[in-house]
Amino acid sequence: MSNEISIKIGSLLNEVRNKKPLVHNITNYVTVNDCANILLAIGASPIMADDIKEAADITKISSALVINIGTLNERTIESMIASGKKANELNIPVVFDPVGAGASEFRNSTTKRLLEEVKISVLRGNMSEIKFISGLGSTTKGVDASENDARTGNDEGIDVAKNLAKKLQCTVAITGATDIISDGERVVILENGTKMLSNVTGTGCMTTALIGAFCGAGSDYFIGAVSGIISMGISGEIALDKAGKIGTGSFHIAIIDAISNLTSNIIEKMNKIKEI
């Protein structure tokens, strides 16, 4: 447990609810509704604009930009690039979720282009996606991490996150049974969460959206990433306790309920943060 970091997270949560940052999501149509609702639950304001005619204009008035390639298509790629460049121009944080990177040439080339043309603030993905981007040869299972990559040890995962963070000059977050976050210097391991989160589609996308909310309310994007990820992990534990035995549908709704009721005191009591 890290009291210093948990205090920073609690303070940033209060900032989110005070500032209500507008978070521009160019995301996928599988989870877009959940991303909007999770942002409302944490206290942020979501907007989902993916047409090239307005995407950059919407980014211009936003506090953060979230790019998610879950349901990738040619039309939205140009919107992602235009919005990303506008965000860079205005020093607006960009959170990138490279869903399924390594699964197809289309995703691979798009991920490469985004990383080349847009300065990313936080890169969040599973172990397979992050290993692929690092050039380490992953074996992705669609949009999920492969069993082999998911078994990657913490020491190796820390090296992967730190090295990629230094290379891209951003915060890298690898989420899974254990979460690893690094900005190239600082490293945190999070052990909150529950296996049941993987039974609800979109919990990763929702986590990325939450990171956008926290980054939009503060200037330390490493803490923003830690805050978004631990908020989902703790809320998953609370949801499991309240609705896990009922089924995945009730558990799904209970996650959003838990996010809406999350407080700095809950984070302080329930966090499983390890500073490395």
UniProtKB/Swiss-Prot annotation:
It is an enzyme of class 2 (transferase). CDD domains: THZ_kinase. SUPFAM superfamilies: Ribokinase-like. ATP binds at residues 124, 175. Keywords: ATP-binding, Kinase, Magnesium, Metal-binding, Nucleotide-binding, Thiamine biosynthesis, Transferase. Substrate binds at residues 48, 202. Its EC number is 2.7.1.50. Its cofactor is Mg(2+). GO terms for biological process: thiamine biosynthetic process; thiamine diphosphate biosynthetic process. InterPro entries: Hyethyz_kinase (IPR000417), Ribokinase-like (IPR029056). One of its GO terms (molecular function) is ATP binding. Pathway: Cofactor biosynthesis; thiamine diphosphate biosynthesis; 4-methyl-5-(2-phosphoethyl)-thiazole from 5-(2-hydroxyethyl)-4-methylthiazole: step 1/1. The keyword Magnesium applies. The keyword Transit peptide does not apply. It catalyses: 5-(2-hydroxyethyl)-4-methylthiazole + ATP = 4-methyl-5-(2-phosphooxyethyl)-thiazole + ADP + H(+). It holds the Pfam family HK. Catalyzes the phosphorylation of the hydroxyl group of 4-methyl-5-beta-hydroxyethylthiazole (THZ). Belongs to the Thz kinase family. This is Hydroxyethylthiazole kinase. It comes from Clostridium beijerinckii (strain ATCC 51743 / NCIMB 8052). The lineage of its organism: Bacteria, Bacillati, Bacillota, Clostridia, Eubacteriales.
